[in-house]
Design a protein with these regions (language model features):
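Terminal catalytic/cofactor-binding subdomain
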Residues: 1-119, 235-237, 247-267, 271-276, ...
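Histidine-centered divalent-metal-coordination microenvironment in nucleic-acid enzymes
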Residues: 28, 122-139, 226-230
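Inter-helical turn/loop segments and adjacent helix faces that build the functional surface
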Residues: 138-141, 240
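Aromatic/basic-lined ligand-recognition segments
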Residues: 141-235
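Flexible helix-coil linker/hinge segments at domain or subdomain boundaries
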Residues: 159-181, 258-292
Length: 293
């Protein structure tokens, strides 16, 4: 798998040398149709009806969304599909879907296909789109562990958002604003990478700690060997998601991937510019003689 990923990481992506081997995507939202994969409960995702949040994890089974017992994994009951337009204003199931892990992990070439297949039918301001990237060479990971990466990616996304004519009240702008209350709570523009790389399991109560995972970029090396971008919102509206919303989400992920490769290219150019050639002196040999009397 890694041999193929390494070969793929030498391709061009949007005209830039691609150094990303594998891609992971997390999509949060609400579903009224079976996405064909497990819908995992996520406490940060909220829709404004008390019975919309599932009490247990969910997954798909024979084309139906089902509740699953947390301990046994057995089906508890199927979730009915809304029969009327009024009922469809609220999702049947809420939470997140997570892309496959190795050896079936996504790449820069097929992540969009997966996103189009499983994207939720409803999203709101509580829903996030997280992007994980990994590398065939650990040196590229270490090059990203710097406070400079977050402002670089934020600016790249801001340029993209302006080019897309994204409305001023869209949640993208809130998440790109380091002073927005939601951003400070869920994707703070802080660099905690030196401590995050050591965390071996997901901590939901880590806010305020030196290793909090709730930052714009989370360096979850010890858990997943990935860099996680947590600053994107989901694209769409509570009343429904359109095909263009999904395509805009795909383009947002593409912007994050391209920004990663751009940053790595800049780092490599800087390293070459700062390299110093050292000319070794020829060896000096001295002979010492002794006279014994």
């Amino acid at each position: 798998m890694w041999e193929a990923a390494e070969k793929m990481s030498k391709d061009l992506l949007n005209g830039i040398r691609n150094r990303i081997a594998l891609v992971g995507i997390e999509l949060e939202g609400g579903w009224n149709r079976d996405p064909g994969t497990s819908i995992i409960r996520d406490g940060s995702v909220e829709f404004h009806r008390s019975d919309a949040r599932p009490p247990r994890p969910m997954r798909s089974a024979n084309g139906t969304i089902v509740l699953v017992d947390e301990n046994s994994g057995r089906i508890v009951e199927p979730m009915a599909t809304p029969a009327t337009a009024a009922a469809a204003r609220y999702p049947t199931a809420i939470g997140e879907v997570v892309s496959p892990r190795p050896p079936n992990a996504l790449t820069v070439h097929n992540y969009a296909v997966w996103m189009r297949k499983v994207y939720p039918q409803m999203v709101n301001e509580t829903c996030g789109l997280h992007v994980h990237v990994s590398f065939a060479h650990r040196l590229n990971y270490s090059r990203l562990i710097t406070p400079d990466l977050t402002p670089f990616v934020v600016e790249q996304l801001a340029q993209w958002g302006r080019a897309e004519c994204i409305p001023a009240d869209h949640m993208l702008w809130a998440r790109l604003n380091p002073d927005h209350p939601w951003t400070r709570q869920h994707c703070a523009h802080l660099f905690l990478g030196d401590n995050q790389v050591k965390v071996v399991k997901k901590e939901y109560n880590s806010r305020g700690t030196p290793h909090s995972r709730y930052t714009f970029i989370n360096y979850c090396e010890a858990q997943h060997h990935t860099v996680e971008y947590r600053g994107l919102p989901m694209f769409g509206r509570p009343e429904g998601v359109t095909g263009e919303d999904i395509e805009q989400a795909v383009r947002a992920v593409s912007t994050v991937l391209t920004a990663t490769n751009k940053f790595l290219s800049k780092i490599r150019q800087r390293e070459r510019a700062e390299s110093v050639a050292v000319v070794a002196r020829p060896p000096i040999m001295q002979e010492f003689g002794a006279v014994i009397r």
